[in-house]
Protein backbone atom coordinates (compact mmCIF):
# COMPACT_ATOMS: atom_id res chain seq x y z
CA UNK A 1 0.00 0.00 0.00
CA UNK A 2 2.84 2.40 0.81
CA UNK A 3 4.57 1.68 -2.50
CA UNK A 4 1.30 2.11 -4.39
CA UNK A 5 0.81 5.46 -2.67
CA UNK A 6 4.36 6.47 -3.57
CA UNK A 7 3.85 5.80 -7.29
CA UNK A 8 0.29 7.12 -7.42
CA UNK A 9 1.16 10.27 -9.47
CA UNK A 10 2.42 8.17 -12.41
CA UNK A 11 -0.45 5.65 -12.37
CA UNK A 12 -3.94 5.88 -13.81
CA UNK A 13 -5.85 7.83 -11.19
CA UNK A 14 -9.23 6.07 -11.01
CA UNK A 15 -7.94 2.49 -10.98
CA UNK A 16 -5.17 3.39 -8.50
CA UNK A 17 -7.64 4.93 -6.05
CA UNK A 18 -9.87 1.87 -6.41
CA UNK A 19 -6.98 -0.45 -5.58
CA UNK A 20 -5.92 1.70 -2.64
CA UNK A 21 -9.43 1.40 -1.22
CA UNK A 22 -9.52 -2.36 -1.80
CA UNK A 23 -6.15 -2.97 -0.12
CA UNK A 24 -7.05 -0.65 2.75
CA UNK A 25 -10.28 -2.55 3.38
CA UNK A 26 -8.37 -5.84 3.42
CA UNK A 27 -5.92 -4.45 5.96
CA UNK A 28 -8.68 -3.11 8.17
CA UNK A 29 -10.24 -6.57 8.49
CA UNK A 30 -7.46 -7.59 10.89
CA UNK A 31 -6.97 -4.24 12.68
CA UNK A 32 -9.30 -5.00 15.60
CA UNK A 33 -7.74 -8.44 16.03
CA UNK A 34 -4.30 -6.87 16.26
CA UNK A 35 -5.50 -4.43 18.92
CA UNK A 36 -6.84 -7.30 21.02
CA UNK A 37 -3.57 -9.22 20.58
CA UNK A 38 -1.60 -6.21 21.83
CA UNK A 39 -3.93 -5.90 24.83
CA UNK A 40 -3.51 -9.60 25.66
CA UNK A 41 0.28 -9.23 25.37
CA UNK A 42 0.02 -6.42 27.93
CA UNK A 43 -1.85 -8.81 30.24
CA UNK A 44 1.03 -11.29 29.87
CA UNK A 45 3.56 -8.58 30.76
CA UNK A 46 1.58 -7.65 33.86
CA UNK A 47 1.40 -11.33 34.89
CA UNK A 48 5.17 -11.69 34.53
CA UNK A 49 5.77 -8.56 36.59
CA UNK A 50 3.26 -9.77 39.19
CA UNK A 51 5.10 -13.07 39.49
CA UNK A 52 8.42 -11.26 39.88
CA UNK A 53 6.92 -9.03 42.59
CA UNK A 54 5.97 -12.01 44.73
CA UNK A 55 2.25 -11.39 44.47
CA UNK A 56 2.36 -7.68 45.34
CA UNK A 57 0.87 -6.75 41.96
CA UNK A 58 -2.69 -7.75 41.05
CA UNK A 59 -3.10 -9.89 37.94
CA UNK A 60 -5.97 -8.60 35.73
CA UNK A 61 -7.61 -12.03 35.45
CA UNK A 62 -11.13 -10.81 34.66
CA UNK A 63 -9.87 -8.29 32.12
CA UNK A 64 -7.84 -11.00 30.39
CA UNK A 65 -10.83 -13.38 30.28
CA UNK A 66 -13.06 -10.71 28.72
CA UNK A 67 -10.38 -9.76 26.19
CA UNK A 68 -9.95 -13.43 25.27
CA UNK A 69 -13.70 -13.69 24.71
CA UNK A 70 -13.64 -10.59 22.49
CA UNK A 71 -10.74 -12.07 20.54
CA UNK A 72 -12.60 -15.33 19.90
CA UNK A 73 -15.58 -13.34 18.61
CA UNK A 74 -13.36 -11.13 16.44
CA UNK A 75 -11.50 -14.14 15.05
CA UNK A 76 -14.80 -15.66 13.94
CA UNK A 77 -15.80 -12.37 12.31
CA UNK A 78 -12.43 -12.11 10.52
CA UNK A 79 -12.70 -15.64 9.17
CA UNK A 80 -16.05 -14.73 7.69
CA UNK A 81 -14.76 -11.53 6.10
CA UNK A 82 -11.31 -12.73 5.05
CA UNK A 83 -12.20 -15.60 2.73
CA UNK A 84 -8.88 -16.98 1.47
CA UNK A 85 -10.14 -17.69 -2.05
CA UNK A 86 -11.50 -14.15 -2.40
CA UNK A 87 -8.29 -12.60 -1.06
CA UNK A 88 -6.18 -14.74 -3.40
CA UNK A 89 -8.31 -13.71 -6.36
CA UNK A 90 -8.03 -10.04 -5.36
CA UNK A 91 -4.24 -10.19 -5.10
CA UNK A 92 -4.03 -12.04 -8.44
CA UNK A 93 -6.12 -9.29 -10.06
CA UNK A 94 -3.88 -6.66 -8.49
CA UNK A 95 -0.78 -8.42 -9.85
CA UNK A 96 -2.32 -8.57 -13.35
CA UNK A 97 -3.19 -4.87 -13.13
CA UNK A 98 0.43 -4.02 -12.29
CA UNK A 99 1.79 -6.17 -15.13
CA UNK A 100 -0.44 -4.28 -17.55
CA UNK A 101 1.63 -1.16 -16.67
CA UNK A 102 -1.27 1.19 -15.85
CA UNK A 103 0.76 4.37 -16.29
CA UNK A 104 -0.81 7.78 -16.66
CA UNK A 105 -0.52 8.79 -20.31
CA UNK A 106 1.26 12.09 -19.64
CA UNK A 107 3.91 10.44 -17.43
CA UNK A 108 4.54 7.14 -19.19
CA UNK A 109 7.85 8.29 -20.71
CA UNK A 110 9.33 9.83 -17.55
CA UNK A 111 12.59 8.49 -16.14
CA UNK A 112 11.98 6.42 -13.00
CA UNK A 113 15.00 7.74 -11.08
CA UNK A 114 13.97 11.35 -11.64
CA UNK A 115 10.45 10.59 -10.46
CA UNK A 116 11.67 8.75 -7.34
CA UNK A 117 14.00 11.62 -6.43
CA UNK A 118 11.27 14.22 -6.90
CA UNK A 119 8.70 12.16 -4.98
CA UNK A 120 11.05 11.51 -2.06
CA UNK A 121 11.84 15.20 -1.94
CA UNK A 122 8.11 15.98 -1.75
CA UNK A 123 7.53 13.46 1.03
CA UNK A 124 10.62 14.64 2.92
CA UNK A 125 9.52 18.28 2.83
CA UNK A 126 6.04 17.35 4.06
CA UNK A 127 7.50 15.32 6.93
CA UNK A 128 9.80 18.15 7.98
CA UNK A 129 6.80 20.47 8.36
CA UNK A 130 4.17 17.98 9.57
CA UNK A 131 4.47 19.22 13.15
CA UNK A 132 2.89 22.49 11.95
CA UNK A 133 -0.19 20.56 10.81
CA UNK A 134 -0.20 18.35 13.92
CA UNK A 135 1.50 20.53 16.57
CA UNK A 136 0.10 18.82 19.69
CA UNK A 137 2.27 15.83 20.60
CA UNK A 138 -0.16 15.07 23.45
CA UNK A 139 -3.02 14.49 21.01
CA UNK A 140 -3.04 10.74 20.27
CA UNK A 141 -5.21 11.10 17.16
CA UNK A 142 -2.74 13.59 15.68
CA UNK A 143 0.20 11.37 16.65
CA UNK A 144 -1.48 8.47 14.86
CA UNK A 145 -1.57 10.51 11.63
CA UNK A 146 2.13 11.32 12.03
CA UNK A 147 2.86 7.63 12.68
CA UNK A 148 1.11 6.58 9.46
CA UNK A 149 3.17 9.02 7.39
CA UNK A 150 6.42 8.06 9.15
CA UNK A 151 5.76 4.37 8.52
CA UNK A 152 4.88 5.00 4.89
CA UNK A 153 8.10 6.95 4.33
CA UNK A 154 10.23 4.25 5.97
CA UNK A 155 8.68 1.54 3.80
CA UNK A 156 9.43 3.61 0.70
CA UNK A 157 13.07 4.04 1.72
CA UNK A 158 13.53 0.34 2.37
CA UNK A 159 11.53 -0.99 -0.59
CA UNK A 160 12.99 0.95 -3.50
CA UNK A 161 16.48 -0.25 -4.57
CA UNK A 162 17.15 3.11 -6.27
CA UNK A 163 16.99 4.97 -2.94
CA UNK A 164 20.36 5.67 -1.26
CA UNK A 165 20.52 3.91 2.12
CA UNK A 166 21.45 5.85 5.24
CA UNK A 167 21.72 3.80 8.43
CA UNK A 168 21.64 6.91 10.63
CA UNK A 169 18.38 8.14 9.10
CA UNK A 170 16.76 4.68 9.16
CA UNK A 171 17.77 4.17 12.79
CA UNK A 172 16.23 7.48 13.86
CA UNK A 173 13.17 6.78 11.72
CA UNK A 174 12.69 3.34 13.28
CA UNK A 175 13.11 4.70 16.81
CA UNK A 176 10.53 7.41 16.18
CA UNK A 177 8.11 4.93 14.59
CA UNK A 178 8.50 2.52 17.54
CA UNK A 179 7.85 5.31 20.03
CA UNK A 180 4.72 6.42 18.19
CA UNK A 181 3.60 2.79 17.94
CA UNK A 182 4.00 2.29 21.68
CA UNK A 183 1.96 5.43 22.42
CA UNK A 184 -0.75 4.32 20.00
CA UNK A 185 -0.97 0.87 21.61
CA UNK A 186 -1.18 2.39 25.10
CA UNK A 187 -3.99 4.68 23.91
CA UNK A 188 -5.92 1.79 22.30
CA UNK A 189 -5.45 -0.40 25.38
CA UNK A 190 -7.10 2.25 27.54
CA UNK A 191 -9.99 2.56 25.06
CA UNK A 192 -10.51 -1.21 24.96
CA UNK A 193 -11.12 -1.48 28.71
CA UNK A 194 -13.13 1.74 29.06
CA UNK A 195 -16.40 -0.22 29.16
CA UNK A 196 -14.98 -2.40 31.96
CA UNK A 197 -14.27 0.73 34.01
CA UNK A 198 -17.94 1.67 33.68
CA UNK A 199 -19.22 -1.67 35.06
CA UNK A 200 -20.68 -0.41 38.33
CA UNK A 201 -21.69 -3.91 39.44
CA UNK A 202 -18.20 -5.43 39.39
CA UNK A 203 -15.75 -3.70 41.71
CA UNK A 204 -12.92 -6.16 41.00
CA UNK A 205 -13.27 -5.72 37.24
CA UNK A 206 -13.18 -1.94 37.58
CA UNK A 207 -10.05 -2.20 39.71
CA UNK A 208 -8.33 -4.51 37.23
CA UNK A 209 -9.34 -2.32 34.28
CA UNK A 210 -7.88 0.73 36.01
CA UNK A 211 -4.65 -1.17 36.69
CA UNK A 212 -4.49 -2.34 33.08
CA UNK A 213 -5.22 1.09 31.58
CA UNK A 214 -2.65 2.83 33.75
CA UNK A 215 0.02 0.14 33.83
CA UNK A 216 2.35 1.86 31.34
CA UNK A 217 0.90 5.34 31.76
CA UNK A 218 4.05 6.75 33.39
CA UNK A 219 6.18 5.28 30.60
CA UNK A 220 3.80 6.72 27.99
CA UNK A 221 3.89 10.17 29.59
CA UNK A 222 7.69 10.08 29.62
CA UNK A 223 7.66 9.03 25.95
CA UNK A 224 5.44 11.99 25.03
CA UNK A 225 7.90 14.34 26.70
CA UNK A 226 10.75 12.80 24.67
CA UNK A 227 8.95 13.16 21.34
CA UNK A 228 9.91 16.78 20.52
CA UNK A 229 13.62 15.95 20.85
CA UNK A 230 13.25 12.71 18.87
CA UNK A 231 11.37 14.61 16.20
CA UNK A 232 14.04 17.32 16.02
CA UNK A 233 16.80 14.70 15.71
CA UNK A 234 14.92 12.88 12.96
CA UNK A 235 14.21 16.06 10.99
CA UNK A 236 17.88 17.03 11.22
CA UNK A 237 18.96 13.64 9.84
CA UNK A 238 16.25 13.77 7.16
CA UNK A 239 17.29 17.24 6.02
CA UNK A 240 20.95 16.21 5.79
CA UNK A 241 20.04 13.05 3.83
CA UNK A 242 17.78 14.98 1.47
CA UNK A 243 20.45 17.57 0.68
CA UNK A 244 23.07 14.88 0.09
CA UNK A 245 20.96 12.56 -2.06
CA UNK A 246 18.10 14.47 -3.67
Task: Mark where each language-model region is.
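Cationic, histidine-enriched alpha-helical/coil surfaces that engage anionic ligands
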Residues: 1-246
Amino acid sequence: RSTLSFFKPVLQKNSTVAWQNTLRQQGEILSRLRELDVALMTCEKIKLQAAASGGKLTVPTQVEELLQKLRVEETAACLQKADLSIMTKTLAQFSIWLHERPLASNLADKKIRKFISRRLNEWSEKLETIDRKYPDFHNMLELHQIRIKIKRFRYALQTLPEVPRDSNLLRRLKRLQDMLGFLHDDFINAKLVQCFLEDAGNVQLRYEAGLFAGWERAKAEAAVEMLPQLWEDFCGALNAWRKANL
